[in-house]
């Protein structure tokens, strides 16, 4: 209703009182859901706005970030795909590439006994959909990196009939 009152007040200011009366009548005849922005119009606008901007020259972002130079120049990251969880049979979280930072100096907090660090990036893990994206991000920030290639498990061929083979000890007698 706020959008309706704003448009009516704008029409009143621009066209005078007579336009106000006709606008109020036309607003009353239009269902309220037609006044809201429909989802297909938003989706149409989003497809037009997804063009990428490419920059040919490499930009130095160190002055913009505010991160101390010791955290930028001497930083080493590890780019990898995490292994499958051994406790489950699913392969969730093994499709994305992760970037993990090296561990810096840690010390024990004398008051609480917690492990403390002065490194703001040590506990951060970044996720990327492609290895090339992670490498480009590391190069853009000036970090050296190690890439651990994705290990694809070799499928083992198994057959149901092998469970009942006469020359294999799959079933042990109890006597």
From Swiss-Prot:
List keywords of the entry alphabetically: Electron transport, Membrane, Mitochondrion, Mitochondrion inner membrane, Phosphoprotein, Respiratory chain, Transit peptide, Transport
Q: Which GO terms describe its cellular component?
A: mitochondrial inner membrane; mitochondrion; respiratory chain complex I
Organelle targeting peptide span: 1-42
Q: Which Pfam families match?
A: NDUS4
What does the record say about its membrane topology? Peripheral membrane protein
Q: Name one GO biological process term.
A: respiratory system process
Transit peptide as UniProt keyword: yes
Give the knockout phenotype. Reduces the levels of assembled mitochondrial membrane respiratory chain NADH dehydrogenase (Complex I) and the rate of Complex I-driven oxygen consumption. Growth is retarded although activity and behavior are not affected during the first 4 weeks. With aging, results in increasing lethargy, rapid deterioration of motor ability, weight loss followed by death. Mitochondrial ultrastructure is normal, although large subsarcolemmal clusters of mitochondria are present in the soleus.
Q: Which InterPro entries match?
A: NADH_UbQ_FeS_4_mit-like, NDUFS4-like_sf
Chief site of localization: mitochondrion
GO MF annotations in UniProt: NADH dehydrogenase (ubiquinone) activity
Q: In this chain, where does the modification Phosphoserine occur?
A: 173
Give the record's family classification: Belongs to the complex I NDUFS4 subunit family.
Query: What does this gene product do?
Result: Accessory subunit of the mitochondrial membrane respiratory chain NADH dehydrogenase (Complex I), that is believed not to be involved in catalysis. Complex I functions in the transfer of electrons from NADH to the respiratory chain. The immediate electron acceptor for the enzyme is believed to be ubiquinone.
Q: Which PANTHER family match?
A: NADH DEHYDROGENASE [UBIQUINONE] IRON-SULFUR PROTEIN 4, MITOCHONDRIAL, NADH-UBIQUINONE OXIDOREDUCTASE
Q: What protein name applies here? A: NADH dehydrogenase [ubiquinone] iron-sulfur protein 4, mitochondrial
